[in-house]
Design a protein with these regions (language model features):
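A conserved beta-strand/loop element that lines the FAD pocket in flavoprotein oxidoreductases
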Residues: 56-71
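Active-site-adjacent segment of FAD-dependent monooxygenases/related oxidoreductases
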Residues: 1-57, 77
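Active-site flanking residues adjacent to catalytic metal/cofactor-binding acidic residues
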Residues: 102, 228-229, 247
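Glycine-rich phosphate/pyrophosphate-binding beta-alpha loops
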Residues: 150, 211-216, 231-243, 279, ...
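FAD-binding beta-loop-beta segment adjacent to the flavin cofactor pocket
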Residues: 209-226, 282-283, 300
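Acidic-histidine catalytic/liganding microenvironments
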Residues: 59-60, 77, 190, 318
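Conserved FAD-binding catalytic core of PHBH/FMO-like flavoproteins
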Residues: 68-71, 78-93, 98-207, 211, ...
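C-terminal helical "tail/cap" subdomain of flavin- and related membrane-associated enzymes
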Residues: 254-344
Length: 344
């Protein structure tokens, strides 16, 4: 499956660093990961999801409903028995022994289930936009840090996927300053973009990501389990949200495959999934909160010259240290491995 997956459009990044004013700090070296692919892959979400939809068609039990939006849960007594959903042809009901909510940070499933959320807040939001890329552009630098400004640029081959980090709730104020001032802010931190900043002509081209860091106190109730961002909204720091979501899914399959084959899933089974995945979730979120508070907030509040924190300079002096964040980004706190057999 991996070979087929890598045929899809993607970019491979083997080293990650940050530009703090005039100083470049290498932060992560993924070439030493104990994995077959010693890189971090970036793939457009459509290609990523389409690949797995195609793989699912190999299994006769797999059925994918496109353009189906969950609107409510079907509840029998205290047990979730399925979902109601809107489709182009009308409302439908889908009933199941177990409903798995994996519908993201604004999860309808977890909201309808009444599951309690513990939120840690976040001092930042992110503005996403695209700017065309030229072969003469500098290589991949994950983050650029200037006084009061942070720009993350992801190489998408033909264009840069840009994330401009702002203070929480500051988007309206930025819009009031005007699009020309925003373009100037971009050029002040990435001057090589020059005329291409003019590609940003309208606020409609810029999408606001409201950053959340939270997790459910309990990921489940009878007949229902939440995983991924539905169970724990991750900060974009490190870009590891998708990794944890996939690891949640693998752990869920490993733990629940046998009970599901017998058509009986108890609360104890669902609790085992949370026990397995709660620790890596909390550790990762703690790390993200530290980066947000100690680095990102400090840069956004700075007015003088930006200098990297002293501990980041250690990564420049001792290259072996770069393997630590590489492992956290590329593998995670508790990696999961598929232990279930393929179902024909």
């Amino acid at each position: 499956m991996l070979d087929e997956f890598l045929k899809r459009p993607h970019q491979e990044i083997r080293e990650v660093g940050g530009q703090f004013g005039d100083e470049f700090i290498p932060l992560a070296d993924l070439t030493h990961l104990p994995t077959r692919c010693k890189f971090m892959g970036f793939m457009p979400q459509w290609d990523f999801l389409d690949f797995f939809a195609e793989q699912g068609k190999k299994y006769p039990q797999f059925h994918l409903l496109m353009e189906a939006e969950v609107t409510d849960l079907i509840v029998a007594g205290n047990t979730v028995a399925g979902v109601q959903a809107n489709t182009p042809s009308g409302e439908i009901e889908v009933r199941a022994t177990l409903t798995v909510g994996c519908d993201g940070r604004s999860s309808t499933v977890r909201e309808r289930a009444g599951l309690q959320v513990e939120s840690f807040g976040a001092p930042i939001d992110v503005l996403w936009f695209r700017i065309s890329r030229q072969p003469s552009d500098p290589g991949q630098v994950l983050g650029r840090f200037n006084p009061g400004k942070i720009l993350v640029m992801l190489n998408r081959d033909e264009y840069w996927q840009c994330a401009f980090v702002i203070r929480k709730g500051a988007f309206e104020q930025i819009k009031q300053r005007g699009i020309e001032v925003f373009r100037h802010d971009i050029l002040s931190i990435a001057p090589f973009l020059k005329e291409r900043a003019q590609e940003i002509t309208d606020w409609e081209q810029i999408k606001l990501l409201t950053v959340l860091v939270d997790h459910l106190r309990k990921w489940y109730r009878p007949g229902l389990l939440c995983i991924g961002d539905a169970a724990h909204a991750m900060s974009p720091v490190g870009g590891v949200g998708i990794n944890l979501a996939i690891q949640d899914a693998v752990a869920t399959a490993n733990i629940l495959a046998h009970p599901l084959s017998e058509n009986y899933v108890s609360l104890n089974h669902l609790q085992k999934v949370q026990w397995r995945r709660e620790f890596p979730t909390k550790v990762t979120q703690w790390g993200q909160v530290q980066v947000q508070e100690r680095i990102l907030s400090a840069v956004l509040g700075s007015q003088g010259q930006v200098k990297p924190p002293w501990f980041l300079r250690l990564f420049k002096k001792f290259p072996v240290l770069r393997r630590i964040p590489a492992r956290l980004i590329g593998i995670g706190v508790r990696p999961e491995h598929v232990k279930t057999h393929s179902i024909s």
